[in-house]
Amino acid sequence: VSESAPRPTLEAVAARAGVSRATVSRVVNGFDGVREPLAERVRRAVDELGYVPNQAARSLVTRRHDAVAVIVAEPETRVFADPFFARQLRGISKELTAHDNQLVLLLTEDRDDHARVARYLAGGHVDGALVFSLHIDDPLPGLIQRAGLPTVFGGRPHWNGGEDGVRYVDTDNRGGARDAVRHLLSLGRSRIAHITGALDQTSAVDRLDGFRDVMADTDPALVEEGDFTAASGERAMRELLGRRPDLDAVFAGNDLMAAGALRALREHGRRVPDDVAVVGFDDMLPIAEQTEPPLTTVRQDIEEMGRLMARLLLRDLEPGTAPDETAGAGPSGVVLPVTLVRRASA
């Protein structure tokens, strides 16, 4: 059995390019100070020899691991069942891959998970962190801050210290909710119910606020809390029908809850949209197109949200730049617009 060819070394690349080992190291590790003709010779030698830098050695030089932690504050059963997370992770993955960075997925459900994640982050395994689906009063932001890692959050900050130099990407949740309710009013509906998401998350709070902006005098009996799952939407719809059987419209805080609400309405013999008009939030395809009837909903670009989170973090990781961590600097956020997509449910 023949032995495999030895792995090309930095010295072999230097000999092929006719330059010093230090010059090869600077080019391979992305440092400035090498004239372009020399840099091109090094790159050509790297290609010809099939040289692959040793990541451990490279990390010692650059102090970079080319790896980013993506922390989702949800149990794995939720993350792998809800297509929202797949969309956001796809956007993050595309951006990181385009810049030769690896994604390290960390899920946290309880305090034991928080401690495990905090130890991992403090261990110097990754260059930064992307965090989403945080819950109000979650200890994660403080743990991440103590690890000293550049971080970008998905969603508006809403925790102690959350106004100091926080980087985040969010959707115009409040404006989207207003658009949804105004659309229902334009259809002549007046007894409009709202199924909220989990109210320990800012997206649900903002959508409830948007609902109240338009329906300031609404009956509290027309609001029921869900948790962004289809089962909670179905349960909430039954509760609402029990309290207010005269309701003529529902704005659900996401498409999964809207799909659950549609099931409950069918069970109770309510026609959609004739008896009750229904609007969701997300435009989660193919769900929104496959409900019966197809769902009118507020579209947010979930994948773009993930891409922008990764892009902001990678920008902070570039040499010579750093996130603004000055106390009192205020959050530095990007808020993405939303659009109402009209289908048959309203």
Question: Where are these predicted regions, by residue range?
Answer:
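Hinge/beta->alpha junction and helix N-cap segments in small-molecule ligand-binding domains
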Residues: 74-87, 105-113, 169-179, 195-238, ...
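Short acidic capping loops at alpha-helix termini that bridge into adjacent secondary structure
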Residues: 190-192, 218-221, 272-278
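N-terminal helix-turn-helix DNA-binding module of bacterial transcription factors
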Residues: 1-66
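Short beta-strand segments enriched in small/hydrophobic residues
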Residues: 23, 63-77, 183, 191-197
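Alpha-helical recognition/docking segments in bacterial nutrient-uptake
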Residues: 1-5, 67-71, 75-182, 242
